[in-house]
């Protein structure tokens, strides 16, 4: 079964910390790929400074396999909700194992996210601490 990591964020801008997390999770958990998913409009903070096109270009220029750019939230438009993205990706990749990658700070706020209880039903969550320790829960 193909294992896909899902790593969302504003990526405004993408930086070495983002790339390091994605690569280390891919290596440590033997993922086939990690999809970097830039949000269109975060539900919990202000609009990114860089435009969607600029952020897509920055990400595209910064990554290589096994990292993959996925513009689903930007293409969908409006406010980005993780649960909507997970529902779409579960339908798009029904035979794959999806693992959502979160920083520990985001994990602790997860209960406040839109339809948080559904997120736990749709995916396993990989929590990465600030020092890049990888933990699958």
For the regions a protein language model found, what residue spans apply to each?
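Nucleotidyltransferase catalytic core that binds NTPs
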Residues: 1-137
């Amino acid at each position: 079964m193909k294992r896909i990591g899902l790593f969302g964020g504003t990526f405004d801008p993408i930086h070495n910390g983002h790339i390091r997390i994605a690569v280390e999770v891919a290596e440590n958990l033997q993922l086939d790929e990690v999809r970097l998913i830039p949000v269109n409009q975060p539900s919990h903070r202000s609009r990114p400074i860089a435009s969607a096109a600029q952020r897509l270009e920055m990400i595209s220029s910064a990554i290589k396999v096994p990292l993959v750019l996925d513009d689903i939230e930007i293409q969908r438009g409006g406010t980005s909700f993780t649960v909507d993205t997970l529902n779409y990706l579960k339908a798009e990749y029904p035979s794959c194992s999806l693992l959502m990658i979160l920083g520990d700070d985001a994990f602790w706020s997860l209960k406040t996210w839109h339809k948080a209880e559904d997120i736990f039903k749709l995916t396993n969550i990989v929590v990465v601490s600030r020092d890049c320790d990888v933990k699958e829960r």
